[in-house]
């Protein structure tokens, strides 16, 4: 990718009771040659059509995100199992080395949309854990997400996807609460994403979430490379 075509936004990860920043999630941002923004979802959809390119871009992004991370805080970075699966051995080794040298880093394994990809995701979780890295399962509750008991057993962090905030009936709330209890009983942490209002923050506290993220705290973001 050409210089100046991407940057990193470090979105704050907040302890919801004290409303203090305890870490950041590194989010890739992209622009066209004319400077106009490109949604990250659109960019990654295009990259998935060329898995080898996806793997190379992922390595470059992770290098930028880790080398420019805010000091003395925990860093959450996303890793797509497809990019891992299609990485050359040398690139995969470099990526693991970057993550290991990155200090307090949690690797978020992005949920996938079919069973074959879910198996790749499970294997990625196992590889990361074997290297002593902390692992988060991203987007729990997503409509088209999949997860395995093996991945759940190994995860250090469970992240709940934002759309459940807008469709949290009694039954779904009970399921989320059961996940939170399970996480705490096994020593894992929970994160609620998509917190946009004070009411969302109050809900996170009521659900006993450990951490939150979202637009409500956008003014605390750190931007590098724009």
Predicted segments with their positions:
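A short, well-structured catalytic beta-strand-centered motif of the EAL phosphodiesterase domain
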Residues: 7-44
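Short beta-strand/loop segments at the ligand-binding rim of alpha/beta enzyme cores
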Residues: 104, 124-138, 183-192
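Histidine/lysine/aspartate-rich catalytic loop segments that bind and position anionic ligands
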Residues: 127-164
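A cross-family glycoside hydrolase active-site/sugar-binding cleft signature
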Residues: 9-11, 76-80, 108-110, 136-138, ...
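Catalytic core of bacterial c-di-GMP phosphodiesterases, primarily the EAL and HD-GYP domains
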Residues: 54-120
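EAL-family c-di-GMP phosphodiesterase catalytic domain
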Residues: 1-5, 16-20, 30-33, 111-115, ...
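A general structural detector for well-ordered alpha-helical segments in enzyme core domains, enriched
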Residues: 91-98, 120-128, 151, 175-182, ...
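Short, basic/aromatic recognition patches
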Residues: 1-11, 54-58
């Amino acid at each position: 990718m050409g210089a100046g075509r991407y940057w990193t936004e470090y979105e704050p990860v907040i302890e919801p009771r004290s409303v203090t920043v305890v870490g950041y999630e590194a989010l890739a941002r992209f622009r066209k040659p004319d400077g106009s923004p490109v949604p990250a979802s659109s960019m990654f959809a295009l990259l998935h059509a060329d898995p080898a390119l996806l793997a190379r871009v992922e390595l470059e992004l992770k290098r930028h995100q880790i080398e420019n991370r805010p000091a003395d805080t925990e860093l959450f970075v996303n890793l797509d199992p497809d990019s891992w699966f299609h990485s050359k051995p040398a690139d995969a080794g470099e990526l693991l080395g970057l993550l290991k040298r990155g200090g307090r880093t949690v690797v978020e394994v992005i949920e996938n949309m079919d069973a074959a990809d879910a198996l790749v995701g499970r294997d990625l979780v196992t590889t990361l854990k074997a290297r002593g890295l902390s692992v988060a399962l991203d987007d729990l509750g997503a409509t088209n997400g999949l997860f395995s008991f093996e991945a759940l057993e190994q995860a250090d962090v469970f992240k709940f996807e934002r759309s459940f905030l807008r469709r949290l009936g009694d039954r779904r709330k009970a399921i989320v609460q059961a996940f939170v209890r399970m996480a705490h009983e096994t020593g894992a942490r929970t994160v609620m994403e998509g917190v946009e209002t004070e009411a969302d923050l109050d809900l996170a506290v009521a659900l006993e979430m450990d951490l939150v993220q979202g637009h409500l705290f956008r003014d605390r973001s750190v931007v590098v490379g724009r």
